[in-house]
Amino acid sequence: RATSDGGSPSIQSLLPAIYPLLKSEFALDSGQIGLITLTFQITASLLQPMVVMFTDRHPKPWSLAVGMGSTLIGLLLLSRAPSFPVLLMAAALIGTGSAVFHPESSRIARLASGGRHGLAQSIFQVGGNIGSASGPLLAAFIIMPRGQASIAWFALAAMIAIIVLGRIGRWYQLQIPNLRRPAMRAAGRAA
């Protein structure tokens, strides 16, 4: 699980790490770089509570793979973006991937904890922090020397993550009936 949360942040942290490349290739000014950041953050942060309002009532086991799929499309678009508006679309897709991925992945970490919720959340956070730290290093060694098109190599990691997350989603789907039983009992006691 820690590796699945590490994968998402490492891909997301590529975006700010390649700002110098994007600034050079597209002749962007600081305001445009700021708009890329704003676009990513709005979708990654502000969209997430809306996703949670829905998934708290209706768990979506496949949202991990779907979120990573959005990130994958964003990466591919970023690797081939011919213009600033397309860069913004790519940033929005990567941010949307994060917003969709993280609520259910946090819930799955708790579910897989075996009752050790604090430990599970800590491992989840460590995975994310390792991912966030590794993204800029990967960008420095892979993308910066080879250019924008090399971003597509990270799509391979996203595809592998989608397969792994699909398997985790299948496991999670099997757990959902067990989650509903205690909630139904608690609702019965409250009535």
Where are these regions (language model features)?
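Extracytoplasmic
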Residues: 3-20, 28, 51
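Residue-level signature of mid-helix packing/kink "hotspots" within the transmembrane helices
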Residues: 13, 41-49, 132-133
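Conserved MFS/SLC helix-loop-helix module at the cytosolic interface between two early adjacent transmembrane helices
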Residues: 46-84
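Cytoplasmic helix-loop-helix junction between adjacent transmembrane helices
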Residues: 90-127
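Flexible cytoplasmic inter-helical loops of multi-pass small-molecule transporters
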Residues: 167-190
